[in-house]
From Swiss-Prot:
Transmembrane segments: 22-44
Cellular component GO terms, alphabetical: membrane
Species assigned in the record: Saccharomyces cerevisiae (strain ATCC 204508 / S288c)
KW Nucleus (keyword) present: no
Listed name of the protein: Uncharacterized protein YBR255C-A
Swiss-Prot/TrEMBL keywords: Glycoprotein, Membrane, Transmembrane, Transmembrane helix
Subcellular location: Membrane
Top-level taxonomic group: Eukaryota
Bilayer disposition of the protein: Single-pass membrane protein
Keyword hit for Chloroplast: no
């Protein structure tokens, strides 16, 4: 499959870094969700007669919901940070290429700076 062009964000190094960051953020979010679910469950058990009378399955669902919600929200927040940093670095790289080309007397179109790479 020679000649396939893939965007730079398919770079294995970038994908590995993103996977690591999202995994760490998900674990932190899950821990925060667990702390919140435990604290709120204790308060609900103390003050809510409805919560005291629900079955174990409902309580487990309540805890799982908070844990997963914490993990998802934290991972999404980390993804947005990663994208912002990635595009900022990409913009700096493009500006550097444009400046170097201008110093040499070459004037490149912004389209020619696409950060695509070909796979061989």
């Amino acid at each position: 499959m020679g000649g396939n062009v893939l965007p730079i964000h398919y770079d294995p190094k970038t994908v590995k870094q993103l996977t690591k960051e999202i995994t760490v953020a998900s674990c932190i979010g899950a821990a925060q969700g667990a702390l919140f679910s435990i604290a709120s469950a204790l308060l609900l058990r103390r003050f809510s007669s409805v919560y005291r009378n629900v079955r174990t399955q409902v309580r487990v669902f309540y805890h799982c919901s908070w844990i997963s919600m914490g993990a998802v929200f934290r991972a999404d927040k980390q993804l947005l940070k990663f994208q912002t940093n990635y595009y900022r670095e990409e913009q700096k790289r493009r500006e550097k290429i444009m400046d170097e080309a201008a110093e040499r007397g070459l004037f490149l179109e912004d389209e020619s700076l696409n950060s695509s790479r070909s796979t061989t």
